């Protein structure tokens, strides 16, 4: 079958959930037996989000091949079977960089390089490069229709239909139908204006996915259809749901997947949504609950920890329990102390991060978890701070810290990796992507994974300082996972504790609702046990 292309645009406001919509459509296509590819085009000029503040961009999602990408790719991987790559996310910065390099090589034979056709051709080439050997290529256009930054991308997808044929390209526009409480009614005008802007660019949407907090009445759908030049059946309600894993089910009930395959002239089997229904049922009707604190410095924007929070929910689904998340500002712990912060908490998790700010608050939280025998999970920087806390307060090593935060520390138990010492550029230069880890027999990590070899994704410059290994092990630290090629410590544990584990990698990037990551399943299980014993 010739590859079909589904382009998703958004209008009215940002953060409507285009990424979730794209992921849910991907899930529905796979449930019908189709092969899909997922891709996000971001209109910002940064080459990638790797150096952007989490407060501006949210989480940076890392792929197996080491790409630092938009958090929407996390949704794509959690909802579909796809393992994404560097081709799955590209930006204006990457497009212009590629075109300028070609111009310098002389690829354009002295021609004047312009947005049309050179930039738009480059965009189309990147779309095609990610759509090989699939039935449906789903492409999300970042930004909001009307933004000047998005224009080259919209022009490129406009050309796509002309070149590939109307029957092979579908435009789906996600828009907002707000309810105005004072008027007591839904308003369609924002959707009308958003579609008007899209049509002025030359794109007539085929399906309107209308985000709303309630069902849109039939007469209002008819009004939207009339003013936006689509059939009434093409106006689909995207109602708010309690659980984001309910979105594919809600879309199917609205007939969205049927509209898509009808338009693209694809014959498929009926979708099997049994697994999604099971997940939603477990989410809504848990047998028990547990409370876990995430201690970090980006907690004002919880999107900074999107994959992390979802992985904990996956752990809850596996344990048939509700996971209540409490976000704790590590800087606040530095200023005010731990106090009663963790009084009703069953597990403490310290995630990755960068910079000195808030580090002592994380160390205080780790000490509380260790001394009070509360299950603790440290990820990336969280593992490194667990090593610092153990070295200081158990092994009695003075002036002990990470050289990232104190270059002249007498005892840098965490230090910069050898191959990072001469690196001066920030973007794309960390240890990124999937690397193997060998697990030690008889350890907690080995029991959790049930195997001796695993592969996990990384994003870091600093590592455990092996010069302190013997001293820390004598104090009771267990090194349970190692990347043997270079002797890099990947997992640490401590003896005589219900559940205390830190890992250098980011397991949250490989967790899915149908396949919870073993570490999160085990950590949530330990927290649930602590809740029962409290």
UniProtKB/Swiss-Prot annotation:
Residue positions binding CTP: 14, 147-149, 187-192, 223
Residue span of region Amidoligase domain: 1-266
Record-listed E.C. numbers: 6.3.4.2
Source organism, top-level taxon: Bacteria
Biological or metabolic pathway of the protein: Pyrimidine metabolism; CTP biosynthesis via de novo pathway; CTP from UDP: step 2/2
A Pfam family that the UniProt record links to this protein: GATase
Residues of the active site: 380, 506, 508
GO cellular component terms given for this protein: cytosol
Family: Belongs to the CTP synthase family.
Protein name per the record: CTP synthase
Organism in which the protein naturally occurs: Syntrophotalea carbinolica (strain DSM 2380 / NBRC 103641 / GraBd1)
The organism's taxonomic lineage, starting at the top: Bacteria, Pseudomonadati, Thermodesulfobacteriota, Desulfuromonadia, Desulfuromonadales
């Amino acid at each position: 079958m010739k590859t079909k292309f589904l382009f998703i645009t958004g209008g009215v406001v940002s953060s409507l959930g285009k990424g979730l919509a794209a992921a849910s459509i991907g899930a529905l296509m796979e449930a019908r037996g189709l092969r899909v590819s997922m891709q996000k085009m971001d209109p910002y000029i940064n080459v990638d989000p790797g150096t952007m503040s989490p407060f501006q961009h949210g989480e940076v999602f890392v792929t197996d091949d080491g790409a630092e990408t938009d958090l929407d790719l996390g949704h794509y991987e959690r909802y579909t079977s796809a393992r994404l790559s560097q081709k799955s996310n590209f930006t204006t910065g990457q497009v212009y960089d590629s075109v300028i390099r070609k111009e310098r090589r002389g690829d354009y034979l002295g021609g004047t390089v312009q947005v049309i056709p050179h930039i738009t051709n480059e965009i189309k080439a990147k779309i095609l490069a990610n759509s090989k050997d699939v039935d449906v290529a789903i492409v999300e256009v970042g930004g909001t229709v009307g933004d000047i930054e998005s224009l080259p991308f919209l022009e490129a997808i406009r050309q796509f239909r002309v070149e590939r044929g109307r029957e092979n390209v579908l435009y789906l526009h996600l828009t907002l139908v707000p309810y105005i409480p004072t008027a007591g009614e839904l308003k369609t005008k924002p959707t009308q204006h958003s579609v008007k802007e899209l049509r002025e660019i030359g794109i007539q949407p085929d399906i309107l996915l209308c985000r709303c907090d309630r069902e849109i009445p039939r007469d209002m759908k008819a009004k939207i259809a009339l003013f936006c030049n689509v059939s009434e059946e093409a106006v689909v309600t995207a109602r708010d749901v309690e659980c984001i894993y309910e979105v594919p089910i809600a879309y199917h009930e609205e007939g969205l997947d049927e509209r898509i395959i009808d338009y693209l002239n694809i014959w498929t089997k009926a979708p099997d949504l049994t697994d999604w229904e099971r997940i939603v049922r477990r989410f809504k009707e848990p047998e028990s609950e547990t409370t876990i604190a995430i201690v970090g410095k980006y907690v004002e924007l919880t999107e900074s920890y999107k994959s992390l929070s979802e992985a904990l929910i996956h752990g809850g689904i596996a344990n048939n329990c509700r996971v209540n998340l409490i976000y704790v500002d590590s800087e606040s712990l530095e200023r005010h102390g731990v106090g009663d912060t963790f009084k009703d908490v069953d597990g403490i998790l310290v995630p990755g991060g960068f910079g000195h700010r808030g580090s002592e608050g994380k160390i205080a939280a780790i000490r509380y978890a260790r001394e009070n025998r509360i299950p603790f999970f440290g990820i990336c920087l969280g593992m490194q701070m667990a090593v610092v806390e153990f070295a200081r307060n158990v092994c009695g090593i003075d002036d002990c810290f990470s050289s990232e935060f104190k270059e002249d520390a007498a005892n840098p138990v965490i230090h910069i990796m050898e191959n990072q010492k001469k690196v001066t550029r920030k973007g794309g230069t960390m240890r990124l992507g999937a690397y193997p880890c060998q697990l030690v027999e008889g350890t907690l990590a080995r029991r959790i994974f049930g195997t001796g070899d695993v592969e996990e994704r990384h994003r870091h410059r600093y590592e455990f300082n092996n010069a302190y290994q013997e001293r820390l092990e004598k104090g009771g630290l267990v090194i349970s996972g190692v990347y043997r090629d270079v002797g890099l410590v990947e997992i640490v544990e401590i003896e005589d504790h219900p559940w205390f584990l830190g890992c250098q990698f980011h397991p949250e990037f490989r967790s899915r609702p149908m396949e919870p990551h073993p570490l999160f399943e085990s950590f949530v299980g330990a927290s649930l046990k602590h809740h029962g014993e409290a």
